[in-house]
Amino acid sequence: MYEYLRGVITEVTPYYIVVDVNGVGYQVYVANPFKYEEDEHAEQKVFVYQAVRDNDISLYGFKNSSEKQLFLKLLDVSGIGPKSALAILANDDNRGLINAINSDDDGYLTKFPGIGKKTAKQIILDLKGKLSDVDSDMLTGQDNLDLDLNASSPYLKESLEALRALGYTKTEVKRISKKLEKYDGKSTDDYLRQGLRLLMS
């Protein structure tokens, strides 16, 4: 089972992206492919889920680990498959999705393709109160911690995400990000160690 792919995004289509990893092109279905247009021809880390059914093996991709986590939660719901879960995430308002589930708002859920009243109620029944471990700050389309890091090393991006996973707030991480951009790190660990030094100084 794959956790993520690191490679160059070589193609963006209306339904999927292609990630070239060491000369092998992986077709990855994503919720909103056009979010990846700015990353085309650049090396990126794409979190993935591999779905195997009958004679079909498909990869589904996500911008960050929290989006993938929410996808997996949706798969736990009876009647929700990978394509339905991806269609729900394509709405790009995952904070609203979580709020709707926790507030019994089945009307909000029925606006998604293929989600009727019965399935909406099932989503609420299965997931209400069970999404606290999903980091909603990373699910609002505000990838990379709302920081302008498009010109930075992918190692820097990963280190900032790791600092958030360690429990540091978005404000704390943002405070040191500019200093880290000037640091000549050679790996994610390099940036992570330097980030921890800055946070503890």
UniProtKB/Swiss-Prot annotation:
Region of interest (Domain III), ranges: 151-201
Renumbered to this chain, region (Flexible linker) spans 143-150
Any GO MF annotation of the entry:
four-way junction DNA binding
**Would you tell me the Gene Ontology cellular component terms?**
cytoplasm; Holliday junction helicase complex; Holliday junction resolvase complex
Gene3D superfamilies for this protein: 5' to 3' exonuclease, C-terminal subdomain, DNA helicase RuvA subunit, C-terminal domain, Nucleic acid-binding proteins
Keywords assigned by UniProt, alphabetized: Cytoplasm, DNA damage, DNA recombination, DNA repair, DNA-binding
> Main subcellular localization, coarse class?
cytoplasm
Classification via InterPro entries? DNA_helicase_Holl-junc_RuvA_I (IPR013849), Hlx-hairpin-Hlx_DNA-bd_motif (IPR003583), NA-bd_OB-fold (IPR012340), RuvA (IPR000085), RuvA_2-like (IPR010994), RuvA_C (IPR011114), RuvA_C_sf (IPR036267)
Q: Domain text from the record?
A: Has three domains with a flexible linker between the domains II and III and assumes an 'L' shape. Domain III is highly mobile and contacts RuvB.
Function in brief: The RuvA-RuvB-RuvC complex processes Holliday junction (HJ) DNA during genetic recombination and DNA repair, while the RuvA-RuvB complex plays an important role in the rescue of blocked DNA replication forks via replication fork reversal (RFR). RuvA specifically binds to HJ cruciform DNA, conferring on it an open structure. The RuvB hexamer acts as an ATP-dependent pump, pulling dsDNA into and through the RuvAB complex. HJ branch migration allows RuvC to scan DNA until it finds its consensus sequence, where it cleaves and resolves the cruciform DNA.
Family per similarity comment? Belongs to the RuvA family.
Identification of the protein by name: Holliday junction branch migration complex subunit RuvA
Species this protein is from: Ligilactobacillus salivarius (strain UCC118)
The gene that this protein is the product of is ruvA
